[in-house]
């Protein structure tokens, strides 16, 4: 799979899942995903791009907080991590090009 073959929704979901894997130990609160995201994640799970499954029912309470109630976990494959890294760089470039602020010295341009 290549980044250019992925839809905008797929790229966005990949970054979301990468964040869950890195910052939350893989725990995913599916309330932050829409039906399309869940379908994509399931498809990726089936083809081995990621591992995306429910956590044990008894673990849900133990890992929940007032603002997060994870019910699933994700593990990214090496390919998924590679593509997420590529997309982070591409997104940073796009966002910088869309910026509404100016760097010192640009005010006169």
Protein language model annotation of sequence segments:
Residues 30-57:
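Short amphipathic alpha-helical interaction segments
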């Amino acid at each position: 799979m290549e980044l250019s073959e992925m839809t905008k929704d797929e790229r966005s979901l990949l970054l979301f899942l990468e964040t869950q894997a890195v910052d939350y130990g893989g725990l995913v609160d599916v309330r932050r995903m829409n039906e399309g995201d869940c379908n994509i994640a399931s498809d990726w799970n089936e083809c081995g791009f990621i591992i995306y499954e429910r956590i044990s029912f008894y673990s849900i309470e133990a890992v929940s907080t007032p603002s997060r109630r994870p019910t699933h976990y994700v593990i990214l494959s090496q390919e998924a991590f590679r593509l997420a890294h590529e997309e982070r760089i591409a997104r940073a470039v796009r966002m910088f090009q869309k910026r509404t602020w100016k760097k010192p010295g640009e005010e006169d341009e």
